[in-house]
């Protein structure tokens, strides 16, 4: 699956775990932490920037919330 992110960035991932990993690897902020730490860090920044809380307990819920809030769109 291919996901469109803000700034016309695209992530190709076969599942939610791969999506989180690719999002982290492409991050200029948190590329050196674990995928789990990245989800938590991203969620903290997102609530400040967008005022929306996203789940971080599983990659599936994290991705689902990013799609629900409009940050990511499956294309």
Where are the language model's segments positioned?
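N-terminal acidic leader/helix
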Residues: 1-29
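Short, compact, well-ordered microdomains
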Residues: 51-75
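Acidic, aromatic-enriched beta-alpha/helix-loop junctions
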Residues: 20-57
